[in-house]
Curated annotation (Swiss-Prot):
The gene is xseA. It comes from the Bacteria. Heterooligomer composed of large and small subunits. It is found in: Cytoplasm. This is Exodeoxyribonuclease 7 large subunit. It catalyses: Exonucleolytic cleavage in either 5'- to 3'- or 3'- to 5'-direction to yield nucleoside 5'-phosphates. Signal peptide: none annotated. HAMAP family: Exonuc_7_L. Bidirectionally degrades single-stranded DNA into large acid-insoluble oligonucleotides, which are then degraded further into small acid-soluble oligonucleotides. It is an enzyme of class 3 (hydrolase). Belongs to the XseA family. It comes from Stenotrophomonas maltophilia (strain R551-3).
Amino acid sequence: MQPRNNDILTPSQLNTLARDLLEGSFPAIWVEAELGSVARPSSGHLYFTLKDARAQLRAAMFRMKAQYLKFVPREGMRVLVRGKVTLYDARGEYQMVLDHMEEAGEGALRRAFEELKARLEAEGLFDQARKRPMPAHVQRLAVITSPTGAAVRDVLSVLGRRFPLLEVDLLPTLVQGNSAAAQITRLLQAADASGRYDVILLTRGGGSLEDLWAFNDEALARAIAASRTPVVSAVGHETDFSLSDFAADLRAPTPSVAAELLVPDQRELALRLRRNAARMVQLQRHTMQQAMQRADRALLRLNAQSPQARLDLLRRRQLDLGRRLHAAFNQQQERRAARLRHAAAILRGHHPQRQLDAMQRRLAALRGRPQIAMQRLLERDALRLRGLARSLEAVSPLATVARGYSILTRSDDGTLVRQVDQVQPGDALQARVGDGVIDVQVK
């Protein structure tokens, strides 16, 4: 039986079908193997074989991925790789193209870390909404760490320099090894249950993933999330992340930074206190000045509205009117005297005795006439002044008081009491009578 033409494939077509089948059947997969025949040409790509005791397969990692490797791949090294299975069409060889490679020992831990992190994250253990805020002023701190490590020295040094008044309790523990995670968890739970601390700090220095593994324990992560006391995690270096970092309420990149985040610098605090004190003194002085100015203005308004002030104003007006009248009288007298002197000079220039006598008679008449007119003017002005005085006396509150009446005002604000419903039993009043003021109380 002869095949049909459309059933016959070329090698390239067959390789293409095989490649599509491989890539569709194998998504990104993980493989742990030993490296063999490692080659790195000038292009920067990596070519090698992945093998175990019974088989091997070709693999490649292109330069864009290979440049981020944290180690130098060598033949015989055991690695954990991730990539996809494909087929190199030109030679019909199937191979893996990798996007990730790490040493196998740490790689296994890394995979376990990622799986546990994903599971706890799905439960909401790392949600930002459940994290507790840090207290504004930490007074007592529990530090859970190794008593001999560099981390505790860094923390205590920074705390002593920045805020020596802080009370610090060191809770010593192992920070790596099989029993470290359980011991750290027990100390954390005990410190939280005591209720004595404002913050609990978990910390240790840097190390490999295996060295830091105690802080990736599931029970410890759950204890951190359940703690009622805020927890700060400062494990390893800035590039190291542990599950305790994600579960804690605050993650610090290093132990020293954690100490700086927890307490203020005493020098900055003292400077801020001095500035605040100066602002408070200035504000108090300004407030007092404003209050005194308001009191002065109120006193001026009160004085301006009192009966005594009105009476004083009328008296000043009366005195001013008298001075003006007296000045006008003097001016008129001066003008008339000047005319008389002028007339006398003219008379002295004429020799006939008869004219002189006549002029003297006229002069005598003229002298009497202004005096009479002036006397009448003065009498009329005096009468007008007496009338004004009687009018002022009639409207003066003090005149009313002198006739036996009294003026009632409130003691607290000086308000004039005009009606009964303005006062209540127990109110303090002042009664102004003719010769003084009497304090009274409403019953």
